[in-house]
Amino acid sequence: MHRKPLLDLLARYRAAHPDEAVCADRIRALVETQRDCFERSCLPGHVTASAWLLSPDGKRFLLTHHRKLDRWLQLGGHADGDADVAAVALREAREESGLAELRFAWAADTPVPVDLDVHRIPAHGSEPAHDHHDVRFVLVAAPGQTIFESDESTALEWFDMDALEDVADDDSVLRLGRKVRRLLAASALQLF
């Protein structure tokens, strides 16, 4: 079953973060009940993946100013049929940043999500409002690369870690950034 790895990942995340059980259970319910949960056509929501992207030294983070949503967000997007959410996060980060050399910030063999979130996406054009069931990872960029803005954004920018509250106005982005800051302070992330 192609969704079993994600269900296992959600179970491990839920066990490690019992305070986030409600969100983990919402995503699990979608994956268990919707055959097409990895397709953007799945309504009322579908699986997405995203990445908090750090500079090689961990002192800065990269956000995109999303064209449709008009706000600063982490890089990420639709699974488009791919059940491997870690691969989706990596693919989307590469596409949206122009950075080819990225790696997961964990020493473990298997990428571990740092956060889960279910958030509402407003209707846009012919697309109805729907939920993104987002699995979030931390990536680190190799040194010496130049960022390139994609057509999905109006801006792409590196920010100092202490500027998080000045830049982000979305609660889920703030929560994600604060989690990463705590992990950096605890030296729990592997940088370049």
Where are these regions (language model features)?
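Unchanged
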Residues: 80-175
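Short glycine-rich, low-complexity/disordered patches
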Residues: 20-24, 137, 190-192
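Charged phosphate-binding loop/patch that engages nucleotide di/tri-phosphates or the phosphate backbone
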Residues: 171-192
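Acidic, metal-coordinating catalytic segment for phosphate/diphosphate chemistry
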Residues: 14-50
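N-terminal strand-loop-strand
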Residues: 39-74
